[in-house]
Structure formats: C-alpha cells, structure tokens
Amino acid sequence: MDNSKDDLICIGFEGTAEKSGVGIITSKGEVLFNKTIIYTPPVQGIHPREAADHHAETFVKLLKEALNEVPLEKIDLVSFSLGPGLGPSLRVTATTARALSLSINKPIIGVNHCIGHVEIGKLTTDAVDPLTLYVSGGNTQVLAYTGKKYRVIGETLDIAIGNCLDQFARHCNLPHPGGVYVEKFAKDGNKFIKLPYTVKGMDLSLSGLLTSAMKKYDSKERIEDVCYSLQETSFSMLTEITERALAHTNKAEVMLVGGVAANNRLKEMLKVMCEEQNVDFYVPEKQFCGDNGAMIAWLGILQYLNGKRMDLKDTKPISNYRSDMVEVNWIHDESKNLNDGNIKSRKIPKHLIGKGAEADISKGRYLEFESITKERVKKGYRILKLDELIRTRRTVKEARFLAAVKECGIHAPSIYDIDKENKKIIMGYIHGKIAKDEIEEGNIEFCKSLGETIGKMHGSGIVHNDLTTSNFIISKNPYIIDFGLGKYSDLIEDKAIDLIVLKKSIMSIHYDKFDLVWNKIIDGYKTYELAESVLECIKEVEKRARYL
C-alpha cells in the first residue's frame, strides 16, 4: 500500500449470515459503494450451507458492480468480516477476500462484525462516545467503550431479538425476514396480551417470551394482537436494559445499530427514553443499520491506519468472535474515562440526589428521621398497561425483599412507608457512598464484605437479579439496595447469573481494577457453603453463550 496517499480506499466484504454485502469507503469516510443482497430461503429457516452458496454467487455479482464504480487499481486495502457468524458463510467471505487480496497484492484485514456496526454508526451520525444497543438476528448486546475495548455491559442470555422475531414469524408461516412482518401486523394490534417480561440487571431473556407468544397464537388470539404484544414486551425489555446500562455508566449518548434498528417502534421507544434521561439518541440511516460491506471496510481502515496488520495465516474466521475480544487500537483519547470530566456524561436533575433507570431519588425527612423517597416514575416508552403492571409489581417486591434481607441479618435500608398508588417507597437514609464511587477512588478493601453479603443473601434463598456496584452503599457495613427485580430461588444457575451480572458491571467501568475487586468479592462469597457449585456454574453459563 502507498502510505503516502492522502485518502486510502478499502473494499469490505460482509457475509456473516444470510446477507452478502460489498462496500467501498475512503479513509476520509466517503462511501463510494455499498450494496447488500439478502438470501431468502425457499422454505422457512436459513440453512448455513445454502447461505454460504448464496455468498459464493452474489459476491461475484456485487464485486463486478463495485468495480464499475471504483476501478480495481484504486483499491488499497481488503477487509472482511472475521466473525462472529455462521461457519460456512464466514469461510466463503474470508476466501473471497483472500483471493482478491492476493490477486491485487494488497493487504488484508479481518474485522469484528459487531464493532463494524458501532463504528459505521459513529461515522454516519454525530455520536462520539455512545452506549450502543446492537440488535440483529444473531446478536443482542449493550456495548460501551472503556479501557481499550468495547465492553459487553448487557446481552441476551439465550436467543437474539432478531432470531426471536424470525422464529415467531416462521411459526405463523410468515416469510423471512420475519421482523418486518411482525412490525406490520403489530401496527393493527389493539389488545395487549400479557407475556413473560424477563430482565436480569442489564441482561434479558427472550426464549420464554417467544414460547408464550407462540402459544398465544396457537390459542387463536389475533395475530395482530400477538405481534403487538410481542413487540411491545420485547422492545420494552431492550429499552429498559439500555436505560439500566445508561444509569450505571453515565454515558451521555445512546446509539441503536443492527438490522432490528430499522424497526420504527424500537426507535421511538429509545428516543423517548433518551429524552426522559436527558441524553442524545442516534441511529444510522437504514442502509447502515443492517449488515453491510461499508461498515467492514471502514473498520478495516481504522485498524490498518493505527498499525493493525494481518498475514493470510491469521485470517481464519472466528465464529464466536465476541466484541470484547477486540483490542481497540484506533481510539486514542483516554479522556473517555467516566470521571475525567473531558467528555459529556448524563446529568442528574438538581432537585434529586439520584436518578436510576427506574426511579427518581429525593432526600427528605420522615417524622424525625432522615429519609429518601424512591419514586418509580412513568416510562413514556412503555404502553400504559405494561408500565403500570411493572412499576406496581416492583414497588411492592422491593419493599418485601428489603424487609426480608434485614431479617436474614443483611444490612439494608429500613422501610418507613409505601405508597403503592404512586409507586413510592420512603426508606431510611444511609450515610455513605455507593460502591461504584468508592472503587473508582481506589478503595477496595470493603469488596470482600460485598461477597460475604451476597453469599448470605444466596444462602437465604434470595436472588437480587440486579447486582451492580451501584446497588451497594458503603457505610460502616455494606448496605444492599434496589430489590425491584429480586426473587426467591434455590437454583444454582439463578445465583450464578446473579454473579455474572455483577461481574459484567464491574468490568464495564472498573476494568482497570477488575481482578482485584472481583477476587476480593469471590473470597468473601466463598463463606457461602454452596459457593463452589455456583462458581462452577458461572463457567458453564458463560461457555454456552451463543449470541455474541
């Protein structure tokens, strides 16, 4: 490559699943060509081998079209999607890129498909340091850049949202891709059907929701009403975990990317949530939402210009290539640390002492006691029936579990009053700092006591379901708060997922202290008699994660 050129040109090949994409882009961010062809199976469902055959045919056609726009001799770099994705599709894509690289004697770079979505979004919008919700057929993740990596703060624990919608559509004999038809039918729905709503901290589960929606359809509910209810429930869950991640990271921007980002209802929900949280919202234009070659080409340029090089022997596809496996070499501004003050962060209204994903927190007095009032405010993005159900249920649940853990000898705020109608809890004010702030200031000795507290809670058959460093107050002892998602369970896997949620929350903003903090927490947790079984289960749950 001629490194003296002012404007380098890269061609990118995207082929991780059923979409073949070729894009050409310059190092100044000018898109010269971008076209995607989707494989539509003759029968329902995508067969990996047939998708690979589709790539083999369409890459030739797309390449000819691309080179009619940009002569071959102007190409300086070849980029392709290294993963994650379907093995056969990835292999055809890599082979195509290698063949072109060898034939024109130009360097080649394999890139992460997921991060390609994020970077093309940043290029084509005004987003600088966003919290990103990435939603597609094979991926559902909440991502944030910190410490030279895009950290996975939240994700699906089973199936991706796009797959959920497609499977439901197939069950109803609707064509592929099913999400388009679900959105179309949902517009004519007028009856909300209660479906499972499963959020665990900043993670979510969609398999139970899918099964229930299928059963509702089979029971002769109108398809319009089932689609409406499926979409409202699943998208509310997606918006909620994004809002939870926003409250934990204090980012000032949210960006929506991926194929499901084309859904207008999801965009509307996220826009409303961002307005309520007073942060900026971005979504790329439609051609850059779904899988496309331009995003692969752009990420290839970013990596190459910042020193990334690849030999052909290093271009073997990685089907489980997670976003957080990539060392980010193209972002050099370390002011993206949350506490530096050199980049925008979410602002808390002055009349509040805290604003979480669910509630506004204000300080006052109850009789002669210092107190706080926690009000679960209405969420404009959720339909009224669902919003009322969730806020009422969680208000009551939180009060019950705060009382329950205190009976188990665990430190928690005292409940003074509950206003179920207005979704308010008045509780004792705890003098101290949240664990997140203590850790950021370098104080970590208390972390062992966090583990002991969690172990005692699990030993009492209580699972928090939203363990983050934002949900502990450090006073003379650690106080645990925010039990809106809590439940009783003796299942080892439920306790393992509780710790996984905490683990990801620590990695998302305390990455530079992660080993020290996590090891101390685990040391304390081992006082729980079933700790080893839970820790072993964590490994099993993390290994089986399919959607990357």
Swiss-Prot record:
Upper classification of the organism: Archaea, Methanobacteriati, Methanobacteriota, Methanomada group, Methanococci
Pfam families linked to this entry: RIO1 (PF01163), TsaD (PF00814)
Catalytic function, reaction form: L-seryl-[protein] + ATP = O-phospho-L-seryl-[protein] + ADP + H(+); L-threonyl-[protein] + ATP = O-phospho-L-threonyl-[protein] + ADP + H(+); L-threonylcarbamoyladenylate + adenosine(37) in tRNA = N(6)-L-threonylcarbamoyladenosine(37) in tRNA + AMP + H(+)
Protein family according to the UniProt entry: In the N-terminal section; belongs to the KAE1 / TsaD family. In the C-terminal section; belongs to the protein kinase superfamily. Tyr protein kinase family. BUD32 subfamily.
Active site: residue positions: D466
Protein name, UniProt field: Probable bifunctional tRNA threonylcarbamoyladenosine biosynthesis protein
GO molecular function, one term: metalloendopeptidase activity
Gene Ontology biological process terms, A to Z: tRNA threonylcarbamoyladenosine modification
Region Kae1, residue ranges: 1-330
Cofactor: Fe(2+)
Binding site for L-threonylcarbamoyladenylate: Y134, V135, S136, G137, G138, D166, G179, E183, N263
Gene3D superfamilies per the UniProt record, alphabetical: 3.30.420.40, Phosphorylase Kinase, domain 1, Transferase(Phosphotransferase) domain 1
EC code(s) of this entry: 2.3.1.234, 2.7.11.1
Keywords linked to the UniProt accession: Acyltransferase, ATP-binding, Cytoplasm, Iron, Kinase, Metal-binding, Multifunctional enzyme, Nucleotide-binding, Serine/threonine-protein kinase, Transferase, tRNA processing
Binding site for ATP: I353, G354, K355, G356, A357, E358, A359, D360, I361, K374
Amino-acid positions noted as binding Fe cation in the UniProt annotation, renumbered to this chain: H113, H117, Y134, D291
